[in-house]
Amino acid sequence: MSIMSYTGGTVVAMAGDECVCIASDLRIGEQMTTIATDQKKVHKVTDKVYVGLAGFQSDARTVLEKIMFRKNLYELRENRNIKPQVLSEMISNLAYQHRFGSYFTEPLVAGLDDTNKPYICCMDTIGCVSAPRDFVAVGTGQEYLLGVCENFWRENMKPDELFEATAQSILSCLERDAASGWGAVVYTITKDKVNVSTIKARMD
Amino acid sequence: MTSFTGITAVANATNEMAMFKQAMKEVAAHPEWMSSRQIERQRWNPYSMEGGSTCAISGENFAIVASDTRMTQNDINILTRDAEKIQILNDNIILTTSGFYGDVLQLKKVLQSRLHKYRFDYRSDMSVDLCAELLSRNLYYRRFFPYYTGAILAGIDEHGKGAVFSYDPIGCIERLGYSASGAAEPMIIPFLDCQIGHVTLSEGYERPELTLDRAISLMKDSFRGAAEREISTGDKIHLVIAEAGKPVVVKFLPLRED
């Protein structure tokens, strides 16, 4: 079994019309054993920028601390909020600095920039960024998610539609991915508020 | 006294050549510069995977089966754009298989000949339930050198209801409402879970009925979604529709070709 699927977990993000949705499951495991059922893999960076870290959760924690450190330093030096584009570049650089001994985590960035344009991107473990206009997924349930998202995503979805599409996608994924589950948390980021919903899913 | 030296020289040379050949053979069999893992990797493998995906949905009085028609080598090299993975065994049994194409063809042949013999012995067509059991046993018969295929058997059972049977390579059988197998299985299955199984819908909500038209459009959607992301799936959808009391309909629908 690969280290990338040791703890399990899945993160997905979808872009809409002046809004983005980012969701993750809540399970942490040690291979087949479930250790915790309340671990969000999505973290707040600024009011409108969130980062998701799938993969090996021990590394994910370390990477999160490094991300927060660099983001704080950036905001102190520049005296402005960090844009999602900048943050993803920063994380990409951080990941590539460890090119030959990488952190086993795949980061995902979702947020709105200062013109409220949605931005989503995902990376591999060494920071190769892919920023499509529709949706991204990382983690053990990636394949399951991409299949469903491909059918649910439409152009210019409003926040409530976007939430529904994201929630349905991750729930369908959790149905089949044994390494993720125990509920999901969905963040809907719009220009004036962030809506957090915890959704019940299979408990096995 | 000097006349025989030529012959011994030739004899020595032949002997030397034989020894050289022997040494070459030995070193080819046990190359010392390669790790055991490298040797393992280069060894001949009786199996290969030609990609592609198949899917089947059953309803109250129908069963539909679809597969793509692409055949690939090493997931990137397209061997043909019209390889058929669906076999209509008789008016109410359809077999669809993906995986190792050699075994796909062999499995099809084996079932065809068994059905032919059944027709000869009993003067009637086999029912889908019987065929499902037959296929399971045929797969398990090869327990230790399996057919490297994910098979799905679909059709109309004796009561006129749609049936889908799903198998693993060694014949573990399950009757399901819908099933998928092949490279894009993880992309198709959760979508059908959501749309047909309604697993993400809370209790108390109205569930739309699964009509033939809805099943066909879901099938098209799932293959379009799969072809978008999975590179060994594409080119055409080969769609077979079996409805109780009606002849089997075969359709080809376009899909991504890149």
From Swiss-Prot, chain A:
User: CDD domains of this UniProt entry?
Assistant: proteasome_beta_type_3
List, alphabetically, the GO terms of the cellular component aspect.
cytosol; nucleus; proteasome core complex, beta-subunit complex
Per the UniProt record, one Pfam family is Proteasome
Matches recorded under SUPFAM superfamilies: N-terminal nucleophile aminohydrolases (Ntn hydrolases)
Taxonomy, superkingdom? Eukaryota
Carries keyword Magnesium? no
GO BP term (any one): proteasome-mediated ubiquitin-dependent protein catabolic process
Q: Which cysteines are joined by disulfide bonds?
A: none
Kindly indicate where the leader peptide sits in this chain: none
**Which keywords, in A-to-Z order, does the entry hold?**
Cytoplasm, Nucleus, Proteasome
Q: Does the keyword Nucleotide-binding apply?
A: no
Instruction: Give compartment(s).
Output: Cytoplasm; Nucleus
Q: How does it assemble?
A: The 26S proteasome consists of a 20S proteasome core and two 19S regulatory subunits. The 20S proteasome core is composed of 28 subunits that are arranged in four stacked rings, resulting in a barrel-shaped structure. The two end rings are each formed by seven alpha subunits, and the two central rings are each formed by seven beta subunits. The catalytic chamber with the active sites is on the inside of the barrel.
The function of this protein is: Non-catalytic component of the proteasome, a multicatalytic proteinase complex which is characterized by its ability to cleave peptides with Arg, Phe, Tyr, Leu, and Glu adjacent to the leaving group at neutral or slightly basic pH. The proteasome has an ATP-dependent proteolytic activity.
Say which family it is in: Belongs to the peptidase T1B family.
| This protein's name | Proteasome subunit beta type-3
What organism does this protein naturally occur in? Caenorhabditis elegans
UniProtKB/Swiss-Prot annotation, chain B:
- Give the keywords, sorted: Cytoplasm, Nucleus, Proteasome
Cysteine pairs forming cystine bridges in this chain are none
The record lists the membrane-crossing segments as: none
**Range of residues in the leader sequence:** none
Asked whether the keyword Nucleus is assigned, the reply is yes
Is Cell membrane among the key words of this record?
A: no
Q: How does it assemble?
A: The 26S proteasome consists of a 20S proteasome core and two 19S regulatory subunits. The 20S proteasome core is composed of 28 subunits that are arranged in four stacked rings, resulting in a barrel-shaped structure. The two end rings are each formed by seven alpha subunits, and the two central rings are each formed by seven beta subunits. The catalytic chamber with the active sites is on the inside of the barrel.
Family named by the database record: Belongs to the peptidase T1B family.
Annotated function: Non-catalytic component of the proteasome, a multicatalytic proteinase complex which is characterized by its ability to cleave peptides with Arg, Phe, Tyr, Leu, and Glu adjacent to the leaving group at neutral or slightly basic pH. The proteasome has an ATP-dependent proteolytic activity.
From the Swiss-Prot or TrEMBL record, give the protein name: Proteasome subunit beta type-1
- Organism, by scientific name, is Caenorhabditis elegans
What gene is it encoded by? Answer: pbs-6
